[in-house]
Amino acid sequence: MLLDTIAAISTPRGEGGISIVRMSGQDSLNILEKIFKPKNKKVSELKNYSINYGHIIDNEHIVDEVLVSIMKAPNTYTREDIIEINCHGGYLVTEKVLEVVLKNGARIAEIGEFTKRAFLNGRIDLTQAEAVIDVIHGKTEKSLSLSLNQLRGDLRDKIATIKKSILDLAAHINVVLDYPEEGIDDPVPENLVENLKKASAEIKDLVSSYDKGKIIKDGIKTAIIGKPNVGKSSILNSLLREDRAIVTHIPGTTRDIIEEVININGIPLLLVDTAGIRNTDDIVENIGVEKSKELINSADLILYVIDTSREIDEEDFRIYDIINTDKVIGILNKIDIKKEINLSKFPKIEKWIEISALSKLGIDNLENEIYKYIMNENIEDSSQKLVITNVRHKSALEKTNEALLNIIETIDMGLPMDLMAVDIKDALDSLSEVTGEISSEDLLDHIFSNFCVGK
């Protein structure tokens, strides 16, 4: 247990029904006794896991009418004594309650320190700590489900199973090398080899799940591009089901990048409506055009829009020539008044979708095509199986598997057992990096810096 007691506001700042001021640490109950006056009881008489009505007091003056939750160690979020003060949700009154708590012995918590204490005190491992922030930031049902699986400890348990296979091998080797008089045969037992091969296959599956998992968690950046007034903003509004971007018949209305997130079948899609790309003397519009060109190179998917009510011209081809990826879907907009267009002039685009953004005709087909394009493999059940979404986990697991394959090769070649020692250590260390059993202070600081102060 860490020695000092920390406190912070755990709810968003601003006005609301309630705010929560949270304390964690060995002095939490002592501090509460100084500042809380429960109705008809003493603080020392309050039961564990109870909610208690009363007032926060500062120098005999009432600060606020509150409900106080008491949770005593070790069965708490941090494995320390935790007090949560539910006060009125005004900005000033919440600050006053926190001020009283700090004045009586607590210190302000660092970013993510409550969850960091849960990790340091052994209640959760590092994968579960990372899952906490993923749950908070979850954008869709699928991403939330993956995060909850990890928070539950699914990845931790899988790592433990893989680690046991390696430790069983290490134990066998130690007996053979340290006690030759026992007469144990040198060859590694077949069941240990099979367990190693199974562990390697499981790691390979986890690593290969990363690309899909990252899409489910973070979504993909999708740029809507085309010349001015082809209907890019109307397409954005149609996909959003609301009027987010200004739509006029005047070319150049969208002068800056507009970003919005939509949910397509459980996949978050960061839609970016770009400024129409054209030659212009307008300084502000020109900045937007340059941003659009940069975005084309960084986008995961491009929606290239053509206005079918007009003839194709040099501007259409100039924008098409900027596209340097095959990750593109062509959109033929305004099909209700379309002209005949020779699509063979756009060989980089294999798939075209006909729509009318104004009347919403074809928008459902566009959404389905975007989803099919992203999910070119069936991952409908990804939320029901173990999927990794963190590049740190992927990198460490790749190192683990490299060491495992070296071990298996050493066994298959019949080489001396002591040659496996380095690879066994590397495999175990890499797995421990995933769970946080081996971690640097810089890594922990980086991970917990993504949290809010009260978490």
Swiss-Prot record:
According to the UniProt entry, the coiled-coil residues are none
The EC number(s) attached to this protein equal 3.6.-.-
| Coarse class of the protein's main subcellular location | cytoplasm
Judged by the first EC level, this protein's enzyme class is hydrolase
Cofactor entry: K(+)
Q: What is the residue range of the signal peptide feature?
A: none
Q: Where does (6S)-5-formyl-5,6,7,8-tetrahydrofolate bind?
A: 22, 84, 123, 455
Query: GO CC: one term?
Result: cytoplasm
Q: Where, subcellularly, is it found? A: Cytoplasm
Q: Which SUPFAM superfamilies match?
A: P-loop containing nucleoside triphosphate hydrolases (SSF52540), TrmE connector domain (SSF116878)
Q: Does the keyword Magnesium belong to this entry? A: yes
Residues reported in the UniProt entry to bind Mg(2+): 233, 254
Tell me one GO biological process term: tRNA wobble uridine modification
Residue sites binding K(+) per the record: 229, 248, 250, 253
How is its cofactor bound, per UniProt? Binds 1 potassium ion per subunit.
Any one GO MF term held by the record is: metal ion binding
Q: Which residues form the TrmE-type G domain?
A: 219-375
Residues bound to GTP: 229-234, 248-254, 273-276
Q: Which UniProt keywords apply?
A: Cytoplasm, GTP-binding, Hydrolase, Magnesium, Metal-binding, Nucleotide-binding, Potassium, tRNA processing
Listed PANTHER family: TRNA MODIFICATION GTPASE GTPBP3, TRNA MODIFICATION GTPASE GTPBP3, MITOCHONDRIAL
User: Which NCBIfam families does the entry mention?
Assistant: mnmE_trmE_thdF (TIGR00450), PRK05291.1-3 (NF003661), small_GTP (TIGR00231)
Subunit details: Homodimer. Heterotetramer of two MnmE and two MnmG subunits.
The protein's name? tRNA modification GTPase MnmE
Source organism (scientific name): Fusobacterium nucleatum subsp. nucleatum (strain ATCC 25586 / DSM 15643 / BCRC 10681 / CIP 101130 / JCM 8532 / KCTC 2640 / LMG 13131 / VPI 4355)
Q: What is the lineage of its organism?
A: Bacteria, Fusobacteriati, Fusobacteriota, Fusobacteriia, Fusobacteriales
